Amino acid sequence: MKLGRYSLFLLCPLLASCSGNGFYKDNLGVIDKNILHADTSLLKSKNKEHYKSSDMVSKTDSIYIGNSSFQTYHGEPLPGKLEGVHGIILRSSTPLGFDEVLSMIQDSSGIPIVKHTTKDVISGGVSSKSLAATVAEKMNSATGGKSTDQFDHLLLEVSSEHQLMDVNYQGALSTFLDKVAANYNLYWTYESGRIAFSNEETKRFSISILPGGKYTSKNSISSDSNSSSGSSGSSGSSSSDSGAELKFDSDVDFWKDIENSIKLILGSDGSYSISTSTSSVIVRTSSANMKKINEYINTLNAQLERQVTIDVAIYNVTTTDSSDLAMSLEALLKHNGGVLGSVSTSNFAATSGTPSFTGYLNGNGDSSNQVLLNLLAEKGKVSVVTSASVTTMSGQPVPLKVGNDRTYVSEIGTVLSQSSTSTTASTSTVTSGFLMNLLPQVADDGNILLQYGVTLSELVGSNNGFDQATVNGTVIQLPNVDSTTFVQSSMLRNGNTLVLAGYEKKRNESVDQGVGTTSFKLLGGALNGSASRTVTVICITPRIIDLKASGE
């Protein structure tokens, strides 16, 4: 019986461990699943499947199907029997005027044709003759001569020459209607069983920008705080004056620029209406001007719809010889990319607040910067500070912050009253880490003009990053921050990696120990020292995203 009890006691921990082991496996499975999900999401944020190739010739092993679509602006489709290779046959031995051409089309197709126009220039010879007479009168008046019938007739022939059209055509009716419209600067539609020609065309265009009256881009990253604390019913407040801040202000009125461009294209021939709430423009003008407006807006939308994914990685290299690292970086970039600006091979001093080394690596499809990391690993111990990917539209800035906000007591005050004494404490916030603002602009040739502003800051105080000051027995925390801020711009090819280096931190340590005093080392002691340098290397890789090519 006792043996049975002992066995039962021994089995209890075993059963408990089995139960705990089950929970452990379940939790481990959940953790592994979350890690996998995080890694998958990180890869998706890089948009690798949408990278646009910068090669002159692109190859694919998959089936190619064009995904470009177009919209017809001529109303209803014409009858199918008139759209074939032998849809309509029109021939004339002599050039015809506008009305004669319309009569021939109507007789051959059986479709009635109407005109909606206020211009007399296409309605017949009377207006052309009047125009010729007016021009002749002005020219004769300017030259001191008198108008003659021969001169009027000559000008009439010159002014009405563009009114005539050679007709010798066989094919689709819509193609011939396009030719007629182009010859007379008109616009045609087919609706309700009839063809209508008009000297003006009305069309609505969508603009690929956000709705709003004025598109203003003001991006900033800063660390500010307001807080209060107190005792005995007292209160206090504070604001941060030691936080890090990086700001890009870009005040651009897209709609004003679009309006000025449309005015320039239309001149006095046409009208327009801009709707900033729907991001659209309605234009009414001649067919020739409408083609120019259509080309301008299509080009504008293509520029505005360009997207860029920017990979940012920051590495710290701890080494004892920074000059060797600088020369090695220079050799690597000259062989695999290029060096931008001057290079200081003696050291990596960043006293000017700007990187002393700037270059780029040619893109090879490797987003992990493995070639650069292999070189850095040969020169010292490499650690990854941060790695992130951001996506933005061409011409729109995007901020990135990887840092730590620290709150500290910046002020302590005492409030005296008749009945009590209270103490107030004011706090502030200081930010250390990495702040960046990126502004990419994709050029027509596929290159990327990249403007980047960077702020690197670090708490270096002796007491966990802070220094301390004692005032009347009260200890005040004072943040000691080392920071570097700069704004630069570079022109890069799609997929190139911009390499910024030159931010160096030196650390010198010395140890002098003895018994009683540091100079007495007979009974034991030590005297040694060490020196190290930490160089920060920033890698920025912009890549153009081609969503249309990926079928999205």
From Swiss-Prot:
Residues 218-243 have a biased composition (Low complexity). It is found in: Cell outer membrane. The keyword Cytoplasm does not apply. InterPro entries: Bact_Secretion_Sys_Channel (IPR050810), Secretin_N_2 (IPR011514), T2SS/T3SS_dom (IPR004846). Keywords: Cell outer membrane, Fimbrium biogenesis, Lipoprotein, Membrane, Palmitate, Plasmid, Signal. It is a lipid-anchor. It comes from the Bacteria. Transmembrane segments: none annotated. A lipid is attached at residue 18 (N-palmitoyl cysteine). It holds the Pfam family Secretin. One of its GO terms (biological process) is protein secretion. Residues 1-17 form the signal peptide. A lipid is attached at residue 18 (S-diacylglycerol cysteine). Residues 218-244 are annotated as: Disordered. Induction: During exponential-phase growth; repressed by ammonium. One of its GO terms (cellular component) is cell outer membrane. Belongs to the bacterial secretin family. Is absolutely required for pilus biogenesis, and for EPEC localized adherence and autoaggregation. Acts at a step in the BFP biogenic pathway after production and processing of the structural pilus subunit BfpA. This is Outer membrane lipoprotein BfpB.
